[in-house]
């Protein structure tokens, strides 16, 4: 029910003391408090903190499990396996240490005396002795009357400092890669040529020994086949043997074959005689059966 504020004010103004109005009409109630947000914040914070603690526990247990497995595997490894692993590691380190880049590989060049023996000429533009007007090592142009070193084979010219530094680690021209000095033949070739007749004589001696061994082998095998060849050789017709044997060698070969044939015939004759005598002896030693024995009763009667 709505109140008429004017009437209330007028009725209060009639009294001198204004507290009477407040006693009769109390003040309005205070506004309601705001809704409690702490009721939702507390459970969420508890869940977040609990999940973080649980995650840390899982990580800690996983770390303990991994370290325990590593200890077990290390204890189960034999000393031989550990030594093999150490050897493999050392081999890998050695291979890696042996690896060098191209510019770190040491190369062998010419001696200082050989470098100084190369011709030094003065540069003059109109002469035409030197091809080009610049050094291929430092790429600087030649100056008039400048001392240059002229390589003997390819006739390329370079500055003295440039080519001397190059030739200390190389043996060829930096421009065309031609060898700077001629390669002389080693002196041991002369000794090889001197010993060559000795080697040829030793080879001849070896050939003779091999031929004598082959003759001995021919004396043992196939006497009947060799007899045909011996008859052919004994007929007086000796043909030239190609390449390896001379006429004297063929005659000696025929003589050897004849001797082998004679020995083969003697062996065959003695063998057949021994075989015949042994078979005859066996027949004499065999007992005679009773049915084949001659009867003596007829003669006694």
From Swiss-Prot:
Catalytically driven reaction(s): S-ubiquitinyl-[E2 ubiquitin-conjugating enzyme]-L-cysteine + [acceptor protein]-L-lysine = [E2 ubiquitin-conjugating enzyme]-L-cysteine + N(6)-ubiquitinyl-[acceptor protein]-L-lysine
Zinc finger (RING-type): 135-177
GO MF term list: ubiquitin-protein transferase activity; zinc ion binding
SUPFAM superfamilies xrefs: Formin homology 2 domain (FH2 domain), RING/U-box
Chain's role: E3 ubiquitin-protein ligase that may be involved in positive regulation of programmed cell death (PCD) by facilitating degradation of negative regulators of PCD. May be involved in the early steps of the plant defense signaling pathway. Undergoes auto-ubiquitination.
Disruption phenotype: Hyposensitivity to the fungal toxin fumonisin B1 (FB1).
Predominant localisation class: membrane
Modification after translation (UniProt): Auto-ubiquitinated.
Family: Belongs to the RING-type zinc finger family. ATL subfamily.
Biased segments, Polar residues type: 287-301
Protein name listed in UniProt: E3 ubiquitin-protein ligase RING1
Subcellular location as annotated: Cell membrane
Chain residue ranges for the region called Disordered: 188-220, 280-301
Segments passing through the bilayer: 46-66
Description of its domains: The RING-type zinc finger domain mediates binding to an E2 ubiquitin-conjugating enzyme.
Keyword hit for Ribonucleoprotein: no
Gene Ontology biological-process annotations: defense response; positive regulation of programmed cell death; programmed cell death; protein autoubiquitination; protein ubiquitination; response to bacterium; response to molecule of fungal origin
Induction: Up-regulated by chitin. Up-regulated by the fungal toxin fumonisin B1 (FB1) treatment and pathogen infection.
Annotated keywords: Apoptosis, Cell membrane, Membrane, Metal-binding, Plant defense, Transferase, Transmembrane, Transmembrane helix, Ubl conjugation, Ubl conjugation pathway, Zinc, Zinc-finger
Enzyme nomenclature, EC number: 2.3.2.27
């Amino acid at each position: 029910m709505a109140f008429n504020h004017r009437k209330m004010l007028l009725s209060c103004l009639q009294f001198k003391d204004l507290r009477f109005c407040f006693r009769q009409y109390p003040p309005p109630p205070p506004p309601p408090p705001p809704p409690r947000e702490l009721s939702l914040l507390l459970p969420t914070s508890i869940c977040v903190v609990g999940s973080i603690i649980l995650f840390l526990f899982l990580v800690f247990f996983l770390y303990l499990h991994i370290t325990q497995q590593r200890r077990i595997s290390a204890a189960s490894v034999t000393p031989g396996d550990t030594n093999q692993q150490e050897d493999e590691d050392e081999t890998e380190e050695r291979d890696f240490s042996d690896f060098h880049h191209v510019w770190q590989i040491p190369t062998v060049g010419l001696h200082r005396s050989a470098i100084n023996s190369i011709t030094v000429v003065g540069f003059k533009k109109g002469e035409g002795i030197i091809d080009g007007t610049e050094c291929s090592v430092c790429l600087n142009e030649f100056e008039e009357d400048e001392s240059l070193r002229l390589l003997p084979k390819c006739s390329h010219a370079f500055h003295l400092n440039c080519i001397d530094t190059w030739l200390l680690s190389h043996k060829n021209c930096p421009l065309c890669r031609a060898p700077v000095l001629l390669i002389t033949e080693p002196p041991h070739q002369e000794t090889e040529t001197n010993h060559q007749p000795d080697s040829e004589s030793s080879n001849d001696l070896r050939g003779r020994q091999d031929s004598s061994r082959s003759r001995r082998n021919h004396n043992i095998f196939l006497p009947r086949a060799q007899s045909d060849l011996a008859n052919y050789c004994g007929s007086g017709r000796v043909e030239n043997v190609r390449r390896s044997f001379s006429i004297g060698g063929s005659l000696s070969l025929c003589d050897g074959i004849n001797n082998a044939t004679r020995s083969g015939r003697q062996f065959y004759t003695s063998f057949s005689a021994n075989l015949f005598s042994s078979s005859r002896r066996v027949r004499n030693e065999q007992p005679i059966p009773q049915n084949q024995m001659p009867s003596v009763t007829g003669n006694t009667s």
